[in-house]
A protein has these predicted regions:
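Sensory/regulatory domains in signal-transduction proteins
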Residues: 2-136
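Juxtadomain coupling helices with adjacent low-complexity linkers
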Residues: 111-170
């Protein structure tokens, strides 16, 4: 399903939590009603679909590289994400994505899927994130993901923080 983006931002109340769960390959296994409402897609469309069905083309690939690196190493991650709705509108979230572990034993480290909870980001955070993502996307278009990774690495090194610490600093 290819969705053409339009310049129309959707928003939701700051007490709303958008939730999805995916399998190891990123296919949606669960979406809560709030998530289905904002993207304007029902379970028949979402369940079994790749989570990137809602990926907005304005999102830099480096953010997803960080996401998968953290998750596959068993760590949670936070990220600001611009997603696309079925009509091409977009919405911003601050996402907390965690690996889901096999719970057959208290010490299991086997990842069986992923859980994402998203909230409405603050305008202050977006004032920093939007221009950063635009810069990263421009770098990726001219020099690939390595170019945006270089920008992020320099930014994080200059601030002396990890990616997650940077994201949580807003």
């Amino acid at each position: 399903m290819k969705i053409t983006p339009i310049n129309n931002e959707k928003t939701f109340k700051d007490n709303v939590l958008l939730v999805t769960k995916t399998d190891l390959k990123g296919k949606i296994t669960y979406a809560n009603r709030a998530f289905m409402k904002i993207v304007d897609m029902n379970e028949d469309i979402l369940v079994g679909a790749p989570h990137n069905i809602i990926r907005h083309p304005d999102m830099p690939g480096i953010i997803f590289k960080y996401l998968w690196t953290y998750l596959q190493s068993g760590q949670e991650i936070h990220a600001y994400v611009k997603n696309i709705c079925s009509d091409g509108s977009y919405y911003w979230v601050i996402a907390n994505v965690t690996p889901s572990f096999d719970n057959t034993s208290a010490t299991s480290t086997k990842i069986i899927g992923y859980h994402s909870s998203r909230r409405l980001p603050t305008q202050g955070a977006l004032a920093v994130i939007k221009p950063l993502y635009e810069k990263l996307l421009r770098a990726e278009k001219s020099g690939g993901i390595a170019a945006s990774e270089k920008i992020m690495t320099e930014l994080l090194n200059d601030k002396g923080v990890s990616y997650d610490e940077f994201i949580l600093s807003f």
